[in-house]
Amino acid sequence: MDVVEVAGSWWAQEREDIIMKYEKGHRAGLPEDKGPKPFRSYNNNVDHLGIVHETELPPLTAREAKQIRREISRKSKWVDMLGDWEKYKSSRKLIDRAYKGMPMNIRGPMWSVLLNTEEMKLKNPGRYQIMKEKGKRSSEHIQRIDRDVSGTLRKHIFFRDRYGTKQRELLHILLAYEEYNPEVGYCRDLSHIAALFLLYLPEEDAFWALVQLLASERHSLQGFHSPNGGTVQGLQDQQEHVVATSQPKTMGHQDKKDLCGQCSPLGCLIRILIDGISLGLTLRLWDVYLVEGEQALMPITRIAFKVQQKRLTKTSRCGPWARFCNRFVDTWARDEDTVLKHLRASMKKLTRKQGDLPPPAKPEQGSSASRPVPASRGGKTLCKGDRQAPPGPPARFPRPIWSASPPRAPRSSTPCPGGAVREDTYPVGTQGVPSPALAQGGPQGSWRFLQWNSMPRLPTDLDVEGPWFRHYDFRQSCWVRAISQEDQLAPCWQAEHPAERVRSAFAAPSTDSDQGTPFRARDEQQCAPTSGPCLCGLHLESSQFPPGF
């Protein structure tokens, strides 16, 4: 018997031992795991969510009693919506009530309807049982799954007992999903998501809910667990832009301390939303996420940065991961209704500014981008009094943006009558930032953001009496700057415009104003030569994400 056969037989025996422990039930793990004693009574120390506390719970406060009465009164409204789902499934009333909170006894049926689990069960009769049995026989990650199951929601009464009923169901779901979707297989945090479904859904329904959550375009959660990681890349870029726009001091401090390069705030947020905050707030946030879709991820991230702005600016470089996680935990240590009100306001604000993450669009011809976006929605007036021409055909890129230098804008010989600055076309995903505004010392966007249509959009065809604006060489910097020297613009404008108008329209940034911008440190860092990998490669290294992503 060779080494391969010996290793195979050892893995098979190990797999059988783990499966046998779960089949025996919670008594199989008592001597080894020193878990809770069987037949223990939890009558007086279990709260309304099912969390087991060490001491006996005090009587209900007036606020808690009011919350229970309010939840009971809302139950009839949710029952009416479920009875007439075709009318309410796309209504504003559903979203409003989701932010106010779903009643606990309605959450299971509502999650099932939102994720369309009944239809999946009808289309795939008996498939879950087949996938579960195959996973028991051939799972390659059963040890990791067993280890993660042992630490999932252990304070909840359903998962309190080691090798108990709910832990066995959770193991079966993860084994079945590993066989159902080999591309994802098993990744970290899937156990926490499946456990949340098991709190309110039967075993097979929870499995199909997990399948729908990871497969639907509305939620786009598979990108966090797939090997490609496209969702993580895009949301990380989107998050950097939104935080840089709303809290420039916070983002500038993080860039100066290199916190964003050492850990993924969005990945940290996703992990903490699962098991780092109270279960009640976690369920409320998941209610909103299932109703709103992936657009709710950015508002949640924005709130975390906004609340912790002062603390984040004081975060030192020592131990960034632990400090950053602790800041997020403190962010959500507040009233649930208050958090949801802030989340709703942030959602409206980002939607109004087109800062939420839109759903993916159809791939464009000639582009190999991982997630293309629709064409630009139009241009913006660059200076006061300038005219704007109708938009032309959108520009196309032959290769991914963040893996190569940006394309040069083609030269145009078409004059611009009247001396007006015209903005005809944009590269896909570059709407929102007029180029001359960057010369005033404002924040400048990265080409890494061009894949996303809510990123800043840089014009490529500014026709100023013939010549086009040139960009700085990307071999030195990955930030695009508009040339603002009068001697370069004067030959284009001297026929019809005096030099004073040129200076007032496109003034060069002064040294004093440029030093105050939070992005200067980033520009100097990216322009300076380094011995490590180039920061202008416009792709995120795997070390920037937490393990398992």
UniProtKB/Swiss-Prot annotation:
Gene3D superfamilies registered for this protein in UniProt: putative rabgap domain of human tbc1 domain family member 14 like domains, Ypt/Rab-GAP domain of gyp1p, domain 1, Ypt/Rab-GAP domain of gyp1p, domain 3
Post-translational modification: Ubiquitinated by a CUL7-based E3 ligase, which leads to proteasomal degradation. Palmitoylation is required for membrane localization and protects TBC1D3 from ubiquitination.
Family annotation (PROSITE patterns): TBC_RABGAP
Protein name: TBC1 domain family member 3D
Main function: Acts as a GTPase activating protein for RAB5. Does not act on RAB4 or RAB11.
Primary localization class, coarse: membrane
Distribution of this protein across tissues and organs: Expressed in pancreas, thymus and testis.
Gene Ontology molecular function: GTPase activator activity
Remarks, miscellaneous: TBC1D3 is encoded by a collection of very similar paralogs with multiple copies of each paralog, some human genomes encoding well over 50 copies depending on ethnic origin of the donor.
Lipidation (S-palmitoyl cysteine): 318, 325
Organism: Homo sapiens
Keywords, in A-Z order: Cell membrane, GTPase activation, Lipoprotein, Membrane, Palmitate, Ubl conjugation
